[in-house]
Amino acid sequence: MISRSHFLAVFASVLFVLQSASAQEWTRFHGPNGQGVSSLKSFPAEWSEENIVFKTELPGIGHSSPVLWGEKVFLLSADPETAERYVLCLDANSGKILWQHDYKSVTHKLHLRSSYASCTPVVDEDIVIFAWSDPQHTWVKAYSHDGNQLWT
């Protein structure tokens, strides 16, 4: 199981890559074209605190990737004990949580290397879509960038 501090470190690392790709939106798993390739020409040779844009305490843990549109980072997280899902939007410059929606769920057996938050959201200029499932349901929820639920 991934620890909260490890989750924060991984999140900060991914965010650095997303921030460095500046003009390129990171809209889905493996980026804009699904190939895991960024327009970033080089990465830091050594990792240090000066390369981190922000650190933010997040609820739960997750194995999904954050996505980026403009100045907003969207991600899915979940409580490893209760399976409660956390749909989050953060300011890409400060790490401040701009909005959050929490959804109760039921626990169930997971793959050894999975979590209750394994699906990466997708985002475009108008909406962000999150998905997750439990043994009885599959949930797909769309939100505006301001956090208003558009459909489920």
Regions found by a protein language model. Name each.
Residues 1-11:
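Bacterial N-terminal signal peptides that target proteins for export
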Residues 21-152:
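Noncatalytic, solvent-exposed loop/strand surfaces
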Residues 9-19:
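Bacterial N-terminal signal peptides
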